[in-house]
């Protein structure tokens, strides 16, 4: 072995056993192969500050395409390079994105050089930043997906502004502020665009709120006038059966529409069948008198305030309808119903009657004034008394009493004077003052008798007694007029005969004495009044 071989072996062993300097190793590695770290702090800043409201697709691609200078760039591969020609220049957004990528890559390289002196600290920082970058990248992807879904909904603009505002505040709390001055401009423009978008949403939401009723008045459905039905003639055709009962040969006729309808069926007709007036054309489906009265009471203030604007025909129709409604409800008093069982208060009936008197005395309706009111009331009372008589006859349990004329008159008088008379006087009370003020009224008499001029006290009470006298008493005892012995003597003999045959008692005679005595106070100075005075004399002679 030569001296040269020995020297060569020593050099080789020295080179192999020489300790490795970490600084030299790091420098060599940095020069030949850069350390693969995850220092993407600037990249995170770009994700936060990129304006995604204008071009979401390009912004997402640019964020995903950021790499180290040595790694391949997305802009240099794939379909994007196809459009990078003279005929198809790149968009301004793409150019601005690549420019920001280059500046941020240089800053990243400088940061990696300054941090390579401390490998332990660099390794720990890289680990923390890796986890932060991963979470922030997921958050950025979630924002992009949310923005895309919001664009597909009708209210996407409004919800996009709210969602982007929330995520931007959250990202600013967990992201370091970039040192790039352009990032502040980008962030301020994003806030301005979000605010502008929110204002547009508010305008779209509320631009028609203050004018939503303008232009819609013409298409609104017409509301029917509640007063028009009272001005229609068909509404007044629902007449009370008491107004035409005297034309039915004494049979009891009931409309069946009243709340106090009778259950009597003397003619064998189906009780569910409504008996109609052939002259009135009453609709079987018409409302009952109670509902019509309540409807009238609800509209009475409006009618009183507006009746002066009606023409003559409307006033006449309104007057007839009000009177028919009033009579249909008051007729229940002649069906052995007391006043407290009626479906309206006494004050309500008085108000309706007062308004009827106002309409009836209007020159556009009639020129007869109070005389026409008394004539209408008399017609109603006479027909209602026929109803009362028929009802008592068909409902009285003792046939012997009903078949005797004296006893039957006593029963009808007691019911009329003890119940109907005072209840009816309370309902017709407003007419008392009107009649007393017009004391020289001319009452239309029935039959062929002339008009009789009545002086002195004339009230509703006298009118009620007069109607009872003419409709109930005189038809039964008028045959005594043709007697040769005189009315009073013939009537006395008749009473003595009935005491033996029909067992007429002193109570029955006293009842007739009361009846004829009260009827004689009418002082009408006519033929009917003279007959009552003769009958009163005959009953006195029989006691």
From Swiss-Prot:
Residues 93-126 are annotated as: Disordered. Pfam families: HbrB. Residues 94-121 have a biased composition (Polar residues). The modification Phosphotyrosine is found at residue 58. Transmembrane segments: none annotated. Its main location: membrane. The keyword Ligase does not apply. Keywords: Cell membrane, Membrane, Phosphoprotein, Vacuole. The modification Phosphoserine is found at residues 59, 139, 144. One of its GO terms (biological process) is TORC2 signaling. One of its GO terms (cellular component) is cell periphery. Signal peptide: none annotated. It is a peripheral membrane protein. It is found in: Cell membrane; Vacuole membrane. The target of rapamycin complex 2 (TORC2) is composed of at least AVO1, AVO2, BIT61, LST8, TOR2 and TSC11. TORC2 forms a homodimer. Contrary to TORC1, TORC2 does not bind to and is not sensitive to FKBP-rapamycin. Belongs to the BIT61 family. Component of TORC2, which regulates cell cycle-dependent polarization of the actin-cytoskeleton and cell wall integrity. TORC2 controls polarity of the actin cytoskeleton, which is required for orienting the secretory pathway toward discrete growth sites, via the RHO1/PKC1/MAPK cell integrity pathway. This is Target of rapamycin complex 2 subunit BIT61. The gene is BIT61.
């Amino acid at each position: 072995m030569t001296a040269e071989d020995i020297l060569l072996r020593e050099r080789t062993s020295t080179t192999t056993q020489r300790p490795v300097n970490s600084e030299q190793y790091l420098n060599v590695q940095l020069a030949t192969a850069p350390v693969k770290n995850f220092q993407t702090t600037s990249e995170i800043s770009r994700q936060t500050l990129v304006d995604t409201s204008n071009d979401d697709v390009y912004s997402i691609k640019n964020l995903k395409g950021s790499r180290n200078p040595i790694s391949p760039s997305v802009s240099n591969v794939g379909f994007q390079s196809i459009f990078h020609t003279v005929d198809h220049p790149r968009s301004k957004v793409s150019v601005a994105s690549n420019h920001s990528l280059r500046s941020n890559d240089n800053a990243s390289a400088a940061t990696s050089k300054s941090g390579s002196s401390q490998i332990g600290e660099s390794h720990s920082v890289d680990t923390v930043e890796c986890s932060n970058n991963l979470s922030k990248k997921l958050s950025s992807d979630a924002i992009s997906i949310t923005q895309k879904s919001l664009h597909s909904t009708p209210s996407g603009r409004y919800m996009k502004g709210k969602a982007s505002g929330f995520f931007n505040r959250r990202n600013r709390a967990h992201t370091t502020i970039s040192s790039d001055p352009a990032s502040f401009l980008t962030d301020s423009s994003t806030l301005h665009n979000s605010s502008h978008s929110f204002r547009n949403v508010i305008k779209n939401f509320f631009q028609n709120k203050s004018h939503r009723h303008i232009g819609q008045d013409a298409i609104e459905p017409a509301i029917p006038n509640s007063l028009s039905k009272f001005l229609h003639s068909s509404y007044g055709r629902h007449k009370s059966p008491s107004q035409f009962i005297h034309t039915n040969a004494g049979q009891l006729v009931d409309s069946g529409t009243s709340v106090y309808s009778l259950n009597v069926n003397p003619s064998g007709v189906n009780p569910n069948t409504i008996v109609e007036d052939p002259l009135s054309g009453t609709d079987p489906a018409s409302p009952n008198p109670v509902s019509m009265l309540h409807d009238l009471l609800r509209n009475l203030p409006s009618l009183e305030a507006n009746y002066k604007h009606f023409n003559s025909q409307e006033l006449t129709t309104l007057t007839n309808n009000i009177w028919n409604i009033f009579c249909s409800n008051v007729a229940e008093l002649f069906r052995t119903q007391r006043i407290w069982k009626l479906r309206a208060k006494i004050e309500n009936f008085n108000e309706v009657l007062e308004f009827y008197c106002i309409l009836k005395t209007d020159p556009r309706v009639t020129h007869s004034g109070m005389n026409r009111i008394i004539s209408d009331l008399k017609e109603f009372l006479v027909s209602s008394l026929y109803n009362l008589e028929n009802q008592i006859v068909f409902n009285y349990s003792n046939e012997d009493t009903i078949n005797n004329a004296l006893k039957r008159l006593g029963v009808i008088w007691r019911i009329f004077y003890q119940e109907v008379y005072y209840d009816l006087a309370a309902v017709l009370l407003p007419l008392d003052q009107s009649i007393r003020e017009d004391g020289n009224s001319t009452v239309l008499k029935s039959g062929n008798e002339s008009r009789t001029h009545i002086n002195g006290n004339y009230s509703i009470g006298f009118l009620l007694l007069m109607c009872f006298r003419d409709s109930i008493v005189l038809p039964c005892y008028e045959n005594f007029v043709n007697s040769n012995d005189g009315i009073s003597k013939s009537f006395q003999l008749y009473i003595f005969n009935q005491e033996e045959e029909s067992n007429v008692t002193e109570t029955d005679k006293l009842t007739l004495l009361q009846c004829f005595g009260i009827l004689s106070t009418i002082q009408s100075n006519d033929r009917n009044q003279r007959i009552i005075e003769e009958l009163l004399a005959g009953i006195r002679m029989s006691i």
